[in-house]
A protein has these predicted regions:
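Expand to "…catalyze enediolate/carbanion chemistry for C-C bond making/breaking, isomerization
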Residues: 1-190
Length: 190
């Protein structure tokens, strides 16, 4: 089936690969698997190999509730830092789109949401789920390259294209092939 408006499906409560594959086979749309339980976390590797999977996300509130994590505690923060890193590594290892951050439930606390969005952007996440219209601009800004990042990337790529050198310095920063590739990616995404 071809869909003109729908470009993908966020599938909640994923616990096994076959759920992702069933939705993909039925709808022929890329799937974002939302991991929301200990069972789902334990199956991350298998889920990441699902046919039709585009990206992983997670449900912070459901996981916190199931595991009886104390909301706002350092322990809860540590748990989700670990989970984010695990999801990011599994996504990279299986060539998925970078993960999508869970919702930020306190939609009136724009400062805290901005900090969270910036943090997960720095971790290499590709976006963030939003539950309120006021969150959309905050998320969009967090996952957009800054003017200074774009300017630096442009200088790097211009120097690389002009000289062919794969090791050089720009603005006192050592540049080698991984930095060049990162700059190319940044400019392509902008």
């Amino acid at each position: 089936a071809e869909h003109e408006v729908i470009s993908g499906i966020v599938l909640p409560k994923v616990t096994k690969a076959s759920q992702v594959e069933l939705v993909f086979e039925s709808l022929k749309l890329p799937v974002v698997a939302q991991i929301e339980s200990a069972q789902g976390i334990s199956q991350l590797e298998a889920i990441a190999q699902s046919e039709g999977l585009m990206a992983l996300s997670y449900g912070r509130l459901d996981i916190s509730n199931e595991l009886d994590l104390t909301a706002g505690s350092q322990a809860e923060q540590d748990f989700f830092t670990h989970l984010r890193i695990q999801i990011r590594l599994v996504s990279q290892a299986h060539n998925l789109t970078a993960p999508i951050e869970s919702i930020y439930a306190d939609f009136k606390n724009e400062t805290a949401m901005k900090a969270t969005a910036g943090y997960v952007s720095d971790l290499g996440f590709s976006g963030m789920l939003c539950i309120h219209p006021r969150q959309v601009n905050i998320a969009n800004q967090a996952f957009k390259a800054s003017d200074s990042q774009l300017a630096f990337a442009t200088k790097v790529i211009e120097h690389y294209q002009k000289t062919g050198d794969s090791t050089f310095a720009i603005e006192g920063v050592m540049v080698d092939l991984p930095v060049i590739l990162q700059c190319q990616r940044l400019l392509q995404q902008s």
